[in-house]
């Protein structure tokens, strides 16, 4: 049943994502909107709710005739360590307000702020989308996006990679690596969990990865690099309107020497092209990090991501950034944890990061 949120002329409500017809209608509208992302889809909100036990509040604005005028997928994030926040889109690198006109943008922004107050979430964070207006802080310096077109064929793709990185990819060809695509979720999770532990950050719950694969169906898959039958690197990717999003990728201890990550991303470019994709979205990275430098080495030009936050006057907005000096001790300690301990504790912490 659809619950009214506020009495406003534009007709704002919280969508019933349990209704398949409602999901299909919203998904079609997002797909048709020029600024839509996979993180605006009902499938993403549902997967996050199921995989991380964080409640979804998917705002939809409708005109008097019932036509959709805008959406704002919000996730209610609660964490005993990091506090409460309302985030769009939870666990996504994109999201924010998607609307047809400025008036609807303003209505959705006001509704998000009111929803945050009602849910006792002192911080509301919008990751991209239309500018919500006065009262919101804008951050265009923390995160960078890396997107470029895919080449017409495999040889052209290899030549599109700058010389130094291209040499690394070529070296990987001689390391007896094999590539498989499909749904080896167990191997992927094990490799991803090891890689984020090595970076000093907690791993997301296994249930989140399973929920995303289930919700996106054929629009998501796992590509794994093996060496003599053993998985050494793996990535879970989303496919949306001709773009591949390698979203969660990582490798084990053997990956560096085998250049498995180099092999993995080149193989994903080839795989995505075979699926009909024309663009490769390498995701976001924090400015000034090794991850950002790695993507630039592949020939991707960084573009700043614009995020918006709002908190009550005099209250600091929630900030969860492992590069913040106040987390440096925790990051160093996490890197030293045995993998079994990191995998046991990590999901409990990470499901509250959002």
Give the predicted meaning of each segment.
Residues 96-99, 147:
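Acyl-group handling in specialized metabolite and lipid biosynthesis
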Residues 103-145:
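Non-catalytic accessory segments adjacent to catalytic cores
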